[in-house]
Amino acid sequence: MNRIHAVILDWAGTTVDFGSFAPTQIFVEAFRQAFDVEITLAEARVPMGLGKWQHIEALGKLPAVDARWQAKFGRSMSAADIDAIYAAFMPLQIAKVVDFSSPIAGVIDTIAALRAEGIKIGSCSGYPRAVMERLVPAAAEHGYRPDHWVATDDLAAGGRPGPWMALQNVIALGIDAVAHCVKVDDAAPGISEGLNAGMWTVGLAVSGNEFGATWDAYQTMSKEDVAVRREHAASKLYAAGAHYVVDSLADLPGVIAHINARLAQGERP
């Protein structure tokens, strides 16, 4: 049948961890712990969505971070430096990720509604398997259990922005066509992943990395501040090629209804 059969969901900032704070805070701490180099939360957010080793590599290439590194060490960051920061990052992230495993508001009800429509729930993450093996059961205790998940280091081909994790979900879930899948993510590399996999893509402008606020801060934010942050996030997600941008996963059923109508007219992603 010519309709959406599966959604492939990101984790932090999409289904759990409103604002995607678990990884950002740990990047700051890992740089500090490994080399006594300071980076800001805003800098830590810039490459979000990549695998974590690649994320650290991208952070080292940010002009401001590279300038600090050069001032301290007289050279740019090396692969060995990235390895050292990653080695500091991993135990910190494994220890902390369960503290950020609660589903974002609306996720549980949305998943139930999608399943009632016969839609399968795939997922993938920029987290490596060692982190996911802690996060997945912790999220399950809170009621979020996707049908499948893939970690960024699971596949020999690699992770985002390549299509491989999304396509592995297609295989595992037995979906007949990538055009019948929606990739949902709060960061640009995840949107690119979906596009590279030939899927419809939906960006989340409020719940995730680009908006970058805690749930409590969001609840007390003025309408003006919300609008400014939403526009900033949405512009980045649309620039990455997202077919749709909405606030959070709770808005997804309406988007899928719209996509189903387009599929019925013969449209493709």
UniProtKB/Swiss-Prot annotation:
Listed cofactors: Mg(2+)
Catalytic reaction list: phosphonoacetaldehyde + H2O = acetaldehyde + phosphate + H(+)
Cofactor note as given: Binds 1 Mg(2+) ion per subunit.
GO terms, molecular function: magnesium ion binding; phosphoglycolate phosphatase activity; phosphonoacetaldehyde hydrolase activity
An individual GO BP term: DNA repair
EC number(s) reported in the record: 3.11.1.1
Keywords per UniProt: Hydrolase, Magnesium, Metal-binding, Schiff base
Record-listed Mg(2+) binding positions: 10, 12, 186
Pfam families found in the cross-reference section: Hydrolase
Record's GO cellular component terms: cytosol
UniProt-annotated catalytic positions: 10 (nucleophile), 52 (schiff-base intermediate with substrate)
Domain of life: Bacteria
Protein family membership: Belongs to the HAD-like hydrolase superfamily. PhnX family.
Function field: Involved in phosphonate degradation.
Record note on quaternary structure: Homodimer.
HAMAP family xref list: PhnX (MF_01375)
Name of the molecule in the record: Phosphonoacetaldehyde hydrolase
